[in-house]
Amino acid sequence: MQGESLLPESAETEIGKRIINVIAGKRRLLIVNGGQSGVDRAALDSALKLMLPCRGWCPDQRWAEDGAIASHYPLTPCGSPTPAVRTELNAYDSDATLVLTRGAPTDGTNLTSDRALAHGRPVLILDLDEQPNVVQFWEWIRAHDVRILNVGGPRESFAPGVVYTRSRKILDLLLDPTR
């Protein structure tokens, strides 16, 4: 048993791919957001699935529209119950912001873009109803030397059953460091 891995072969293969990509210079992003239902939660779940680091500021009491944000998400209360404060902090603490939306951005999604731009951070807006171009996404990441990516967009209540599901599929595709 000595010298043998305790990991299942599938895990070893996945870990091996990630090591090769790190050696090859592929970038591993740190994902940041406030943990709201919808796009934020999809980004955190994608990061956790893909073993990418994630963090962010959330409102006090870990408030989200669907109740308290689960403790397994590594978020820090921002000292205010106001979602705009966490939006500001997450925009400031990142190198760039990716916004996923359906059609034209609305209220909180606009605030995310506005705050990022106010802090001189580039913003990329992708529509949830369109297939993203992975190559163009990574070219944008490299062009702006992004290491910390704020990800935002509408809450789940904007389009129940759609926002999280589509965001998750897109983010699993875009953020996968083995691609």
Give the label of every model feature segment.
Residues 4-148, 153-177:
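Acidic/glycine-enriched connector segments
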